[in-house]
Amino acid sequence: MINTRKNHPLMKILNESFIDLPTPSNISAWWNFGSLLGACLAIQIITGLFLAMHYTSDTSTAFSSVTHICRDVNYGWLIRYLHANGASLFFICLFLHVGRGLYYGSYTFIETWNIGILLLFAVMATAFMGYVLPWGQMSFWGATVITNLLSAIPYIGSTLVEWIWGGFSVDKATLTRFFAFHFILPFIIAAMAIVHLLFLHETGSNNPLGLISDADKIPFHPYYTVKDALGFLLMLFFFLSLVLFSPDLLGDPDNYSPANPLNTPPHIKPEWYFLFAYAILRSIPNKLGGVIALILSILILAIVPFLHNANQRSMIFRPISQCLYWALVADLVTLTWIGGQPVEHPFILIGQVASILYFSIILIFMPLATILENKLLKW
């Protein structure tokens, strides 16, 4: 008898990825976030598709089309808030997923890690362009400020900004192209996620101990399908609680005012998930320096595998590195808070100290801590 699951060309791929996949028997709940990110992407694509059916990417009608979705379309308010808060959920899962990779040394799978960094950049670009689409005050000014940063690039900066804008300011052409890119990027992200999985399945999953687990692997189904389903239900509970009880908690009130180029909001800031990078950008007085620091704040993740000089892969038995890791987490929380504050004393100074600390922990303190830990283990 032929087993279709194992012999059918298409089913075979799915079987080897989600059913008979040999998985370490000791992976914890921190390994749930990969599947949760897949669920987030599915939610975003489905809700986004329904929103795109009613949205118009024209400066004169964009804001009112979003209002129309919320007021006149059946369950339009729900679709809109699922999509807006789905982005926040996506980033919560992303940060936890990257955090888990850093803690347990998953970055030693260099190809998987690098595709992950590209995915992070793609998701950030998609979220930024999506924030512009409702054409509220913060949408317009956020787009103006962030795209204007490219003018810091020597020689070609100003031309590049005008090329992205499609004119001499953020206007109709900008909104139309942002909508086009915002629509196509999630499908590119889905394709990249498949490549991410492809590279992961070449090496197999890491585990909390950071040890080779070939001798002790179990099939993905039913053990981890059930575990992922539980994670998904828990995520859905918190997500729907946010959407149905407090949908505007993470948004900006300024975005309920239509975009007005003649009236600048007192404090321009992006969504909460970009605030840590925004704080790093603002903490450097020089424009070009700020832009470089902004890009490096994410790109620094690509250097992490080359800074790894510990005898153990995971941080689970490395207490000094653990302390530094949690200091880094606290530092990122501080940067997120600072990014949402006005540019005045003492926030400027706190932001500068937190920015220096962010780069110092990753580039200097963590490698030094691993050298010390290696010596202590020998001793």
UniProtKB/Swiss-Prot annotation:
Binds 2 heme b groups non-covalently. The cytochrome bc1 complex contains 11 subunits: 3 respiratory subunits (MT-CYB, CYC1 and UQCRFS1), 2 core proteins (UQCRC1 and UQCRC2) and 6 low-molecular weight proteins (UQCRH/QCR6, UQCRB/QCR7, UQCRQ/QCR8, UQCR10/QCR9, UQCR11/QCR10 and a cleavage product of UQCRFS1). This cytochrome bc1 complex then forms a dimer. A ubiquinone binds at H201. It is a multi-pass membrane protein. It holds the Pfam family Cytochrom_B_C. One of its GO terms (molecular function) is metal ion binding. Heme 1 (or BL or b562) is low-potential and absorbs at about 562 nm, and heme 2 (or BH or b566) is high-potential and absorbs at about 566 nm. Component of the ubiquinol-cytochrome c reductase complex (complex III or cytochrome b-c1 complex) that is part of the mitochondrial respiratory chain. The b-c1 complex mediates electron transfer from ubiquinol to cytochrome c. Contributes to the generation of a proton gradient across the mitochondrial membrane that is then used for ATP synthesis. InterPro entries: Cyt_b/b6_C, Cyt_b/b6_C_sf, Cyt_b/b6_N, Cytb/b6-like_sf, Cytochrome_b, Cytochrome_b_C_euk/bac, Cytochrome_b_N_euk/bac, Di-haem_cyt_TM. One of its GO terms (cellular component) is mitochondrial inner membrane. It comes from the Eukaryota. Heme b b566 binds at H97, H196. The keyword Transcription does not apply. Its cofactor is heme b. This is Cytochrome b. Belongs to the cytochrome b family. It comes from Zapus trinotatus. It is found in: Mitochondrion inner membrane. Heme b b562 binds at H83, H182. CDD domains: cytochrome_b_C, Cytochrome_b_N. SUPFAM superfamilies: a domain/subunit of cytochrome bc1 complex (Ubiquinol-cytochrome c reductase), Transmembrane di-heme cytochromes. The keyword Transcription regulation does not apply.
